[in-house]
Amino acid sequence: MQSRATQHHLTRWVGIAVTTTLAAGLAGCASAEPEAGAAPQTLVLVTHDSFNLSEGVLEKFTSETGITVQVQAAGDAGELVNKLVLTKDSPLGDVVFGIDNTFASRAVNEGVLADYASADLTEAEAEYLLPEGSGREQLTPIDNGDVCINVDHEWFADNNIVEPVTLDDLIKPEYQDLLVVPAANSSSPGLAFLLATIAAYGDDGWQSYWANLVDNGVKISGGWSDAYYVDFSGPSSEGDRPLVVSYASSPPFEVPEGETEAPTGALLDTCFRQTEYAGVIAGTDYPAEAAQLVDFLFSVDVQNDIPESMYVFPVNSAATLPEGWANYAEIADDPYVIEPDDIDANREEWLTQWASIATP
């Protein structure tokens, strides 16, 4: 993975070392479940607006435990964490899903999460764990995906223009007025793209890169839905911009019925790796049952449903991908990453600087 650049040089992210003691370390992540009183009739799952599972999936948890799951949406990943922080003295629910690696450290540092991480993880899922002290003890990885530039192949073929490949290409004159991105201060994919540019160009270079993007006519939309479904020229939209920030897993859902070729694709040299987590909310009256729900979200019953319900990859190595994903949905071999603690320490300053450049 490509880490944050220092003095314009890309370094490589080593990741979390997997040692012979990993299995014990994973088991140690799970806190001892406190004794519970009377089991609840309902658990509240606080999540982002994009949460979706097929009909009947959450009912499997109910059939196993007798507990109904009430889903409460709370905005995107950033809004979700903000609301958890603002209500930590009177928690919104029992379990949270949708905190990603760009906001994990803030949630941990603000004390909104109880010490529980599922013991069901194996060495195969170790790459998705957060560092110790930055969420490993409180957050269980559930899904992941790469936020990348998506390209409308048909548009470029019709206009006889070679498709871009890298971030550097996006500021070239031939791609003027072709890119739309969600705002970094109001969209999780938008923030992920900003972080990709920070990782690529470093503290001294990303601001100039964004100034060049603005000069080259980048359009800033309010959120991912507007960027993808309104401004993008792909088949799901009526827009006129053939380049958009989306996910590497978006192209499979653009394949027309009966066809074998995806009309869009992801530029895998532009990607930022995003992982979403679930955790027990501190202050829940039902910590043991909340822990069961976290384990259920990691279970194959949920993991097999995630790709076609939320358009991202499951992290459970035992999960099965839908037919077609192997052909159209890709994961970048070398995505950009920034350590969660680094994001937490600099996020607000980066967003302030970004806003002064991108939305003057």
What are these regions (language model features)?
Residues 150-155, 274-289, 297, 305-309:
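A bilobed periplasmic-binding-protein/Venus flytrap-type ligand-binding module shared by bacterial periplasmic
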Residues 175-185, 297-321:
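Periplasmic-binding protein-like
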Residues 101-112, 133-162, 190-200, 275-279:
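Periplasmic solute-binding protein
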Residues 30-32, 36-106, 236:
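Early extracytoplasmic/lumenal segment of secretory-pathway proteins
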Residues 113-122, 139, 168, 248, ...:
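Short beta-strand->loop
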